[in-house]
Amino acid sequence: MRVNITLACTECGERNYITSKNKRNNPERLELKKYCPRDRKVTLHRETK
């Protein structure tokens, strides 16, 4: 079952990316290093509801 999730920057809190994940394979919250246009650098982004 794939669900849509939002990735938010851990430094500024801005929600920059929307993606989907398979809850069966990844039950925990997703953490990815992505580019934040507000900070103008690569930061850690965490899954939010």
Curated annotation (Swiss-Prot):
One matching Pfam family is: Ribosomal_L33
Question: Its GO CC terms?
Answer: cytoplasm; ribonucleoprotein complex; ribosome
Q: Which GO terms describe its molecular function?
A: structural constituent of ribosome
The Gene Ontology biological process terms listed for this entry are: translation
Keyword annotations for this protein, in alphabetical order, are:
Ribonucleoprotein, Ribosomal protein
The record's family statement is: Belongs to the bacterial ribosomal protein bL33 family.
HAMAP family on file: Ribosomal_bL33
Q: Which NCBIfam families match?
A: PRK00504.1, PRK00595.1, rpmG_bact
The entry's protein name is Large ribosomal subunit protein bL33A
Instruction: State the organism of origin.
Output: Geobacillus stearothermophilus
What gene makes this protein? Answer: rpmGA
